[in-house]
Amino acid sequence: RSQSAPLPLLPTTLDPLPPWPSHPLLYPEFSTHCKDLIPLPSFYLPKIYSLLSPTPTDGVTESQFSTFAKTHLIWSLDEIYYNLTKSPSSPYLSPSSFRPILTSLLSHHPGLTFLSSHTDFQQKYIDTVIARIFYECDEEGLGYLTRRMCRKGKVWEAFEEVGREEDINKVLRFFSYEHFYVLYCRFWELDLNRDYKITKPDLLKYGDHSLSSLIVERIFERGRRFKVDGEPDEMCYEDFIFFMLSEENKQSHVAVKYWFEVLDGDGDGVLNTKDMKTFYNVQSHRMQCLGHEVVPFEDVLCQMYDLIKPRSEEGVVVEDFLQPECDKVSGALFDALFNLNKYLQFESRDPFLERTKREDEFDNDWDRYACLDYNRLAMEEEQREDDRNQMEEEQRE
């Protein structure tokens, strides 16, 4: 399990700087000399060097670094991260604020250097990390992050972790390469024309056609997006990440809010019986067409109300789903309304497998799904490689 440790406390006063060479330090010497003076991971050093040295060949003097330390390294650690990540001219963190830091991470982290010959994958990895950060932290869809939002989302704890952990796949929050690979491959499977956009017919194929046509319509109409100004009938890669993280981890508070907004067609903040029956009618029709026994809507509604105990007679509000006792059932309730395959799996679940799932190593459904799917993708790729090798051998013979 990946546990983000709390940010360490910094001393309230700066110790005297160690002896500084008489000449300005160019980046290689600067990074060696200053890596222990700056309380951030080494992949922040290129950004700091660029702030202090007007050009790559000017170098940094002792006076410049001393002034920088006295003005930038006296804050709390989360403030240091925030201020050194954002642009000096901006009061907030935008998606582009993270790009220089993540570009540096790609060249510094031992678990990512293999991507150096795959520029396209490097950029998609950066896109993925940024989208995951904003998915977790920018719940209001503002398009930027404040100090408070970063602190609440424990962004810098994840940066600390990726700075000290050599196995990138152990950093499950934001940075795991395996998680990126799963997200990107799932998008790639649906984006058949390779225009980096998903349409409604594309999304209907997700999860072996598990989603109803009505929920797909609503996802495009009301689903939270990374790009608020995107085309309404198209979903970019980052928008797809928002969808997929919500779909495969319905127990998370972020996903609950995502699906509640999608289901709440009139936007009044209440899911009433009419709202839910509209979705269930589509679901029950699909079950009938496939020969499955259909549970009456009234029985589903009664079960739902017994589990979440809504506080209002008018219907269910998002706070009802967010109660601690609803963490384990919210996903099943959503699936009953619009995901046929998962709903049928839930209805026929094996108690032994459910107990095994509760006792496994994963903290949430997304981590579990990503691990299993990555292993599946890796096995498929290995099989394709074996088939190619066999064909080459046969051709040589």
Protein language model annotation of sequence segments:
Residues 1-18, 181, 207-210, 215, ...:
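Long, highly charged low-complexity segments
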Residues 5-69, 75-95, 100, 116-142, ...:
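Primarily EF-hand calcium-binding motifs
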Residues 30-32, 67, 98-100, 150-152, ...:
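Conserved beta-strand elements of beta-rich interaction domains across eukaryotes
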Residues 39-40, 107, 111, 138-139, ...:
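Flexible helix-coil junctions and inter-repeat linker/turn elements that act as hinges
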Residues 43, 77-78, 94, 110-114, ...:
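Intrinsically disordered, low-complexity regions enriched in proline, serine, glycine
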Residues 92-107, 272-278:
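Conserved long hydrophobic alpha-helices within structured protein cores
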Residues 98-123, 147-171:
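Short, flexible helix-coil linker/hinge segments at the edges of structured domains or between repeats
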